[in-house]
Structure formats: structure tokens, C-alpha cells
């Protein structure tokens, strides 16, 4: 199981991923709101099976 936290921003977002034992799989990494940004995100997350996402959307968007 992998756990990913995404901080949603107006122009770019940040993602960090940890494993079940708390091991850091991806330190805070930015990704954009375009196709290449989401391709980058999917590369960082790996396969969708076994990945739990949490979003922090504190802005008005």
C-alpha cells in the first residue's frame, strides 16, 4: 500500500508518497495542471491499485 498526499494549488500542485512502513517513496514534488503535469503525477504514484490519495485543498479553488 502507498499513501499519497496532494496539496492543491492555483497553478501547480505538490505530491508526496510514503509506503506502509512510513518509508518515503517520493519527497514533495511539484506537478502542473496540464497533461504533462498529470503524466508526471501518475509516474510518481505508480499503479492505482494499492494507492490511497488524500487532498489538501485550502484555497477558494
Listing of model-derived features with the role each one plays in the protein:
Residues 1-61:
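Phosphate- and other anionic-substrate recognition elements at nucleic-acid/protein interfaces
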